[in-house]
Amino acid sequence: VTQTVKEKFLDLLKEQSSYEEAIGLMAWDMRTKAPKKGMDNRSEVLGVLSEKVHEIQTSDKMKSYIDELKGQDEDPVLVKSLEEAEETYNKTAKIPGKEYREYVTLQSKAESMWTEAKDKNDFESFRPYLEELVEFNKRFADYWGYKEHRYDALLHNYEPGITVSKLEEVFPRVRKALTELLDQIKKAPKQPDPSVLEGHFPKAQQEKFSEEILKRMGYDFEAGRLDETVHPFAIGLNSNDVRVTTKYDEKDFRTAVFGTIHEGGHALYEQNIDPKLTFTPLATGTSMGIHESQSLFWENFISRREAFWQNHYELFKRHAPEKFESLPLDQFYRAINEVKPSLIRIEADELTYCLHIMVRYELEKALIGEEIEVKDLPELWNKKMEEYLGVKPEMDSEGVLQDIHWAGGDFGYFPSYALGYMYAAQIEKTMSKEIDINRVIEQGDFKQIQEWLTSRIHQYGKMKKPLELLEEVTGEGLNPDYLVDYLTHKYKHIYQF
């Protein structure tokens, strides 16, 4: 049977996404269950498969199908798949193959050097690798091209449509509001007591509670599973296989509970993408920021709100150690929402989190724009942490070396976290006009919330660009005031000032 060009193109996309699914499954395995001695072999296999994907994306076949089909068909899934494939082709084709291979090798070396450097608190041993990564990223940005700022070309990889000038409109406003709020909180007479949460909380019990909450959120365990790992993540292999991982700390249940809900938010997005997008490059979240908005929506806007615990505190106490039996809900709620500037981003509370991101954004942007050099990073990092958060790292492993992102060459990624938070606040505000969120949560029924998110966001996968989606859902462009209002209102109530 002679295939049409459209069929051949869709077959090629299917081949590509099949390799990607295999890569995803291996990556999940490496980070959860794989034996230590098998790691080197596994890395080799991943390298071979990644090269296959790269070959397909940049093949003459791909190019000729794109050229032949462009403008020929009205089918929206095909049109968007072509756009996506063409953008990937152009982006990848602009980088010489030899350079790309060198870069991939450097990434894996840099990641293992970073792990060592972090353990030994030795920035100098990692510095040459980071310098090379920065040079590669500057070159790549030049290959790809940009209008105003070289950093824009890197932002585009994670958040299409976002530029330095857009960030400069919102970040300084948010920073000013948050630092002022932080000052008021530090001076507030009524401080929560986090010690009420301390004590041994067996892993098995945390796991049961976490599973129960995931089920209530609408996570489908027949299309997923919950496992343990060191750095929690969610991974969507396809919409019927979306896995969640978490980390248990028997001395602090918050790590697993809020971590699982966060990853569960990512997973719900992937589980609810329209099946007709399967085997296309559209069967995933539209951007890092929109993905993060979904995890932060569930973690902060749902599971850290009072109504959530009014409904779930009894369930929690059934699984929790005995000491919680006598702990009043009010004290519990205030303790889980304590604001305390920390050195470590992933331990940050919801108010200071954006400030951590802004430190990284300022430094990244300056590195790519050649305003600063890699050797200046530790000192500048510490200075900015003191200026924004009022805390100063004593050593680089709790400062500039804490995150893996730069070691993996992920420049331009960090702003997505803060954008996701702003998107989430804006989405929540819109939802609250249509749904009485507190009442729905108090009744313990998240179905309405999940259906709202699926119909407006999840089902579209990558069919819509992030800012287009935001505007369609909320009726306006990015507006950081919703996040500032949410945090101000919430913490005035908790800290009573």
State what each model feature region is.
Residues 105-253:
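Contiguous, non-catalytic segments that form substrate-binding/exosite surfaces or channel walls
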Residues 255-274, 292-296:
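Active-site recognition of the HExxH zinc-binding catalytic motif
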Residues 9, 145, 262, 295, ...:
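Divalent metal-coordination and catalytic microenvironments
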Residues 284-325:
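Post-HExxH zinc-binding segment in Zn-dependent metallohydrolases
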Residues 1-160, 463, 488-495:
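A well-structured
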Residues 5, 37, 41, 58, ...:
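C-terminal, non-catalytic "cap/extension" segments appended to globular domains
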Residues 171, 175, 203-207, 213, ...:
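All-alpha helical catalytic cores of prenyl diphosphate-utilizing isoprenoid enzymes
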Residues 222-223, 276-280, 304-314, 374-375:
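Acidic/polar loop patches that form or flank catalytic/metal-binding clefts of enzymes
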